[in-house]
Amino acid sequence: MARDKIALIGSGQIGGTLAHLIGLKELGDVVMFDIAEGVPQGKALDIAQSSPVDGFDAHYTGANSYEALDNAKVCIVTAGVPRKPGMSRDDLLSINLKVMEQVGAGIKKYAPDAFVICITNPLDAMVWALQKASGLPHKKVVGMAGVLDSARFRYFLADEFNVSVEDVTAFVLGGHGDTMVPLVKYSTVAGIPLPDLVKMGWTSQARLDEIVDRTRNGGAEIVNLLKTGSAFYAPAASAIAMAESYLRDKKRVLPSAAYLNGEYGVKDMYVGVPVVIGSKGVERVVEIELAGKDREAFDKSVGAVQGLVDACKKIAPDLLGR
């Protein structure tokens, strides 16, 4: 049986890590695309040469033409300018919006049936623009944000409680930025809600607040440490979890930047919420009850995303007609 074709649009740090993980998990054959000549070809060859050692048979190719995306089953988009120290995700807006228009046109022409995962920042606005530019169904275009933000939250909690990350569940909703909403109420350790763990004396509310704040600034913390780029291992692993759920119809519930058309009181926007990802794409939006401070924080986050989308509309008004 022929292996699925997975196209990686952007061959930087995340793209290279994605390509290697796809081989290790044997999810399919890989096409690495980039506008920089030689870069995708070199990385594809390097990773392919690791296959005899790691024991996988995926086929790797590098390309500088969108034609290479032809009939890809999954497209993962990392193309764009990465964050640098002192730079917010929003600073990237005008530059990466142009990139999304080009990428969307390429996907529309060569991979119109693909499941598309966007990683490019500012995420929520870029996935909105990518869907507009590609014209693909909303359920087939999604943004990778919540899986990563939730993974950071889970890691910090596991470290705080000195337990396995496997026993920690956590959800982060809203936009992928400073206004994201880590939900303490719906986060657990071995099924025990975090508020109960505070009552049990495992931690304090003040400490939980610190962890929530660190989660919100998780990306910036790594940018400031690296000084020359942004995170790539955890973002790549997060996107692979989404791609695997689609390719293998696992129907995992994953927090993702998904299109909302009335859910959570939001219309015509991509915002981070829990969704079921299966072979049809985003098969269901999981609408959990938000109240009090959580609702206020979510609405504030939606407002921030709306501001970015409005900015996109001003910069590229032609997207609205698509």
UniProtKB/Swiss-Prot annotation:
It is an enzyme of class 1 (oxidoreductase). Gene3D superfamilies: Lactate dehydrogenase/glycoside hydrolase, family 4, C-terminal, NAD(P)-binding Rossmann-like Domain. The active site is at 176 (proton acceptor). Its EC number is 1.1.1.37. Keywords: NAD, Oxidoreductase, Tricarboxylic acid cycle. Substrate binds at residues 83, 89, 121, 152. This is Malate dehydrogenase. It comes from Bradyrhizobium diazoefficiens (strain JCM 10833 / BCRC 13528 / IAM 13628 / NBRC 14792 / USDA 110).
